[in-house]
């Protein structure tokens, strides 16, 4: 075996030369000729593997190392994966978008914008997959490229078509970040791994949940950015990352037959973040039929390679990387493993048959898969694409040397530099400028409409389309087609007749069908087609050995997007008759529909708005949305229909507050609230007309999504992507689903003072001072109504009240205090105070309010920024607000506090520690994991600096827990082994290292270090 460390395979920071940027993902092309890497620098780079594996090629000046740099993403690229056909490259980024890349055969090459790197190959974005609301962390292609699945930090799993890349299904079954995805090689399941401590297996037939696997992840940490799972090539084993066996980090093996997870790979010192099965099966060591080879990458910076049946790994690489492993990828031969790390380097592990045994043939692999009883009906179009010369699999590395100042024509005359497996060059396609003809028309409103038309230099239009997708027509061969049995015909017919997408669609060039072939068959009858096929078979039986081969020579050219099936081998004439009858009906309906669309389009140059009935269509044909059929009236000027009722400072009778304490909001003729790209609008009228409630799409010219009416005027509204809520004057709150169905009608104790929402949580504060909170998705109340009057003191003291992303309320007061509600203790908790801004040494006086985006990521910091802004204004006398505004009538300024000189030091230490403790508590309640860990470490450092032994011991005991604690036997214990996804004992280890630095705490720390070490052992 050998280990290769190509230092030139790297992503360099543009602003800091020589410094390497993190490489998040690595993927080897199915023909092993190319290596794609994805980096923190927002770029994808494609490298020639020949220069990596072959020292002679690496040292050859004529060999190209970097083939292309792809730079269309606007954020860090977190994952790259090649399609199994080899044609497409898919990438996912933290810009929330996944891109599908395709090699442009007519591309000019050159360099990326803003980069000096020269591209030998020209890769262009083929499709843009937009649908996630946060980082796209992982993606996977189905084995036959029928589907592609993307997962992200928005907790969603989105399944796309692998042929036309339309969105097929959104799976919203996880409750945490989804960080890994893999398809079953048999095509039956899709597995996803999430921070909600589950791996879920979904059926590809209906995308329903088959099994949720939880046992290996009950105590797994959430610190890992990836949880990349892998499926064995024979489909029998699912390998899951970031699993735990007690306190030990493991990779869990899940058996397909029973979904049991009692087998582990043990040995890594930190979480396993990526798993990868070799695509081959090998001769078994343990006397079994075969064995599999698997690689693991961990946060402990090491890579291990295992063979099933052996108790020990065959390779453990500990010193290859300086930082954690991010991704793994096997080449098609099953012996070469590529790994990347966050230190910005790539390593290649080339194994020998002596180390891991001999690989078995593809026939043996198919036999092993067949044992599961799953009939693998492959997507014909997707499977066939892999055999076409339109991708890169059949021409793995056709490279041309480029010279400065050399024209495209001159470069075309330079002989290509072939690499093993390349195909002969073909006549270059006309440049894009030659193929594009534009028709520009001016609409009635003065806008330009550009209608591009592809035309060829010496080709018919249909031929130009075919050449755009392929260098040359693929020869017809039934050997390239998957074997489809006779009993599968009804399913194929159903797919042909019942779908409007090209799941079975043929692209130009499929089965020898290209633009040069005659289209006369499409105008004939099905009987004529069959007769022609049979006659051709009788006249030339050698050339037409099967009905399929005969039919392929007579098939008309079918445009991309037309549903279309492929006849199986051995089909009878009756089956072919039925097939062509159904196909012809679909084909002629498509032509008729296009003619109708063209006729309708010629009537007017104006584009009809969405929601307006199309010509010749009725509401029964296309359905409708309430309020979308008629143009919406202009809102007109905003008027106050009812003045606000000012709140009282408090009416007290017999020690009990009574009456209205907070202001009743005014009733406006127009009330609109825009939140997270959504808008909800209220239009109030006099008593002669009902109130209109509408949800609008501001990105589409305020298109009405749904409309409702109310006999009572509305005062407040709020909306999220899950629901909308409206508060009425009669103390009623109406709740609507995202599509406009009314799912709630709640009568509160009094009218609403504030109505806020976030995610699935709705919060209402009434004028009587009671706060209500509901989880709309779970359809239940979070807690009983709680008073906010004791927080305010005076209604004017309220600065803001919002709902955090996890549903916790955040109340910020003008008196420089911030509170949230602890659902466990059912009480208000002070999480920030201007007192700390004045006296705590941990306070950051430079922070300022930066908006909602920061509050979601770092809520504690954002809250302190608001308090700090108030504090600075008060101290500097600029727009004085805050603590000087008291509810007392005399407005007496606060008395300055003084601390005796001999106690000032203890005073500062005490205030600082109380401040850090409040930060830790706030981060816990607001589910801010990163802030929790940062403040915990800062708290430990401060205790160590001051040498405070009693608080140090309290901190250690809270993290180490009971010495004899066993999760499986003590489920009801009050102590929990994790907090916010962190393992408490791991945190305890870090805290002990900090507390061990001062000598006066050594005697306290050492016994706990020994106890913790024994627990891990």
From Swiss-Prot:
Classification via SMART domains: WD40
Bias-annotated ranges (Acidic residues): 598-608
Segments of skewed composition (Basic and acidic residues): 618-638
Keywords, in A-Z order: Chromatin regulator, Nucleus, Repeat, Repressor, Transcription, Transcription regulation, WD repeat
Main location: nucleus
GO cellular component: chromatin; HIR complex; nucleus
InterPro entries in the cross-refs: CAF1B_HIR1_beta-prop, HIR1-like, HIRA-like_C, HIRA_B_motif, WD40/YVTN_repeat-like_dom_sf, WD40_repeat_CS, WD40_repeat_dom_sf, WD40_rpt
Cell compartments where the protein resides: Nucleus
Gene Ontology process terms (BP): chromatin remodeling; DNA-templated transcription; regulation of DNA-templated transcription
Domain of life, source organism: Eukaryota
Chain positions of WD repeats: 18-57, 72-111, 131-170, 173-212, 221-261, 267-316, 320-359
Family annotation (Pfam families): Beta-prop_CAF1B_HIR1, Hira, HIRA_B
Ranges for region Disordered: 387-438, 591-638, 880-899
Stated role: Required for replication-independent chromatin assembly and for the periodic repression of histone gene transcription during the cell cycle.
Similarity remark: Belongs to the WD repeat HIR1 family.
Protein's name in the database: Protein HIR1
Taxon lineage: Eukaryota, Fungi, Dikarya, Basidiomycota, Ustilaginomycotina
């Amino acid at each position: 075996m050998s280990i290769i460390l190509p230092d030139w395979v790297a992503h360099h920071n543009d602003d800091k030369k020589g410094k390497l940027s993190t490489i998040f993902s690595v993927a080897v092309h199915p023909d092993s000729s190319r290596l794609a890497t994805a980096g923190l620098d927002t770029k994808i780079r494609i490298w020639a593997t020949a220069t990596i594996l072959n020292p002679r090629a690496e040292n050859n000046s004529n060999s190209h190392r970097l083939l292309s740099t792809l730079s269309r993403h606007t954020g860090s690229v977190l994952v790259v994966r090649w399609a199994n056909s080899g044609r497409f490259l898919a990438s996912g980024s933290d810009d929330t978008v996944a891109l599908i890349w395709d090699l442009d055969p007519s591309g000019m090459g050159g360099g990326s914008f803003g980069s000096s790197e020269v591209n030998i190959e020209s890769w262009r974005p083929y499709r843009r997959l937009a649908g996630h609301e946060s980082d796209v962390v992982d993606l996977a292609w189905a084995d036959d490229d029928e589907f592609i699945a993307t997962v992200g930090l928005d907790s969603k799993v989105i399944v796309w078509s692998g042929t036309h890349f339309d969105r097929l299904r959104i799976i919203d079954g996880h409750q945490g970040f989804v960080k890994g995805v893999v398809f079953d090689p048999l095509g039956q399941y899709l597995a996803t791994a999430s921070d909600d401590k589950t791996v879920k297996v979904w059926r590809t037939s209906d995308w329903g949940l088959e099994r949720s696997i939880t046992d290996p992840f009950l105590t797994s940490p959430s610190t890992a950015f990836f949880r990349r799972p892998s499926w064995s090539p024979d489909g029998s084993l699912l390998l899951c990352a970031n699993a735990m066996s007690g306190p030990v980090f493991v990779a869990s093996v899940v058996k397909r037959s029973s979904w049991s997870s009692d087998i582990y790979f043990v040995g890594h010192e930190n979480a396993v973040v990526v798993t990868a099965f070799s695509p081959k099966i090998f001769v078994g060591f343990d006397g079994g039929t075969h064995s599999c080879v698997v690689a693991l990458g961990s946060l402990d910076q090491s890579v291990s390679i295992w063979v099933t049946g052996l108790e020990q790994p065959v390779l453990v690489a500990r010193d290859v990387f300086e930082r954690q492993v991010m991704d793994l990828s096997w080449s098609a031969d099953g012996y070469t493993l590529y790994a990347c790390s966050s230190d910005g380097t790539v390593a290649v592990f080339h194994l020998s048959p002596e180390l891991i045994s001999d690989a078995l043939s593809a026939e043996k692999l198919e036999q092993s898969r067949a044992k599961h009883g799953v009939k693998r009906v492959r997507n014909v179009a997707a499977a066939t694409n892999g055999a076409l010369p339109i991708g890169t699999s059949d021409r793995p590395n056709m490279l041309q040397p480029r010279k400065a100042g050399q024209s495209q024509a001159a470069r075309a005359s330079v002989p290509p530099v072939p690499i093993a497996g390349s195909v002969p060059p073909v006549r270059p396609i006309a440049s894009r400028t030659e193929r594009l003809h534009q028709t520009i028309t001016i609409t009635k409103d003065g806008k330009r409409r550009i209608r591009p038309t592809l035309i060829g230099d010496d080709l018919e239009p249909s031929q130009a389309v075919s050449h755009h997708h392929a260098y040359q027509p693929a020869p017809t061969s039934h050997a390239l087609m998957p074997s489809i049995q006779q009993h599968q015909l009804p399913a194929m017919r159903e797919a042909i007749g019942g779908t409007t997408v090209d799941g079975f669609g043929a692209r130009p060039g499929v089965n020898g069908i290209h633009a040069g072939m005659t289209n006369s068959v499409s105008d004939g009858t099905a009987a004529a087609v069959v007769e022609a096929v049979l006659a051709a078979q009788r006249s030339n039986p050698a050339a037409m050995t099967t009905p399929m081969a005969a039919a392929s020579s007579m098939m008309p050219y079918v445009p991309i997007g037309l549903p279309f099936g492929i006849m199986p081998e051995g089909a009878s004439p009756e089956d072919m008759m039925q097939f062509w009858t159904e196909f012809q009906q679909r084909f002629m309906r498509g032509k008729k529909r296009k003619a109708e669309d063209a006729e309708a389009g010629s009537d007017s140059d104006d584009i009809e708005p969405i929601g307006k009935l199309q010509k010749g269509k009725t509401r029964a044909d296309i359905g409708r949305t309430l309020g979308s059929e008629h143009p919406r009236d202009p809102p007109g000027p905003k008027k106050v229909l009812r003045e606000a009722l000012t709140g009282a400072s408090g009416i007290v009778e017999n020690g009990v507050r009574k009456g209205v304490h907070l202001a009743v909001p005014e009733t406006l003729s127009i009330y609109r609230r825009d939140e997270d790209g959504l808008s909800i609008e209220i239009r109030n009228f006099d008593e002669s007309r009902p109130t209109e409630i509408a949800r609008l799409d501001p990105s589409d010219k305020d298109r009405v999504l749904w409309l409702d009416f109310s006999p009572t005027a509305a005062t407040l509204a709020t909306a999220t992507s899950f629901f909308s809520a409206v508060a009425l004057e009669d103390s009623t709150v109406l709740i609507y689903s995202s599509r406009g169905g009314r799912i709630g009608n709640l009568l509160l104790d009094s009218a609403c003072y504030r109505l806020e929402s976030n995610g699935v949580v709705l919060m209402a504060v009434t004028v009587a001072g009671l706060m209500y909170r509901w989880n709309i998705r779970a359809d239940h109340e979070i807690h009983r109504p709680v008073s906010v009057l004791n927080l305010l003191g005076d209604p004017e003291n309220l600065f803001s009240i919002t709902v955090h992303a996890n549903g916790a309320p955040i109340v910020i007061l003008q008196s420089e205090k911030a509170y949230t509600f602890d659902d466990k203790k059912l009480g208000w908790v002070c999480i920030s105070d201007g007192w700390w801004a004045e006296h705590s040494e941990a306070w950051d006086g430079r922070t300022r309010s930066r908006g909602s985006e920061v509050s979601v990521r770092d809520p504690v910091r954002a809250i302190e920024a608001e308090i700090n802004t108030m504090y600075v204004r008060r101290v500097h006398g600029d727009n004085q607000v805050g603590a000087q505004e008291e509810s007392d009538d005399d407005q007496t300024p606060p008395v300055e506090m003084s601390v005796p000189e001999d106690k000032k030091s203890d005073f500062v230490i005490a205030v600082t520690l109380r401040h850090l403790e409040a930060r830790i508590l706030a981060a816990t309640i607001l589910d801010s994991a990163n802030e929790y860990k940062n403040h915990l470490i800062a708290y430990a450092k401060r205790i160590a600096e001051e040498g405070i032994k009693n608080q140090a011991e309290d901190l250690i005991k809270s993290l180490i827990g009971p010495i004899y604690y066993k999760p499986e036997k003590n489920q009801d214990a009050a102590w929990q082994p994790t907090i916010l996804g962190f393992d408490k004992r791991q945190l305890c280890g870090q805290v002990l290292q900090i507390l061990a630095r001062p000598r006066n705490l050594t005697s306290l720390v050492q016994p706990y270090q020994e106890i913790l070490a024994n627990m891990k052992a």
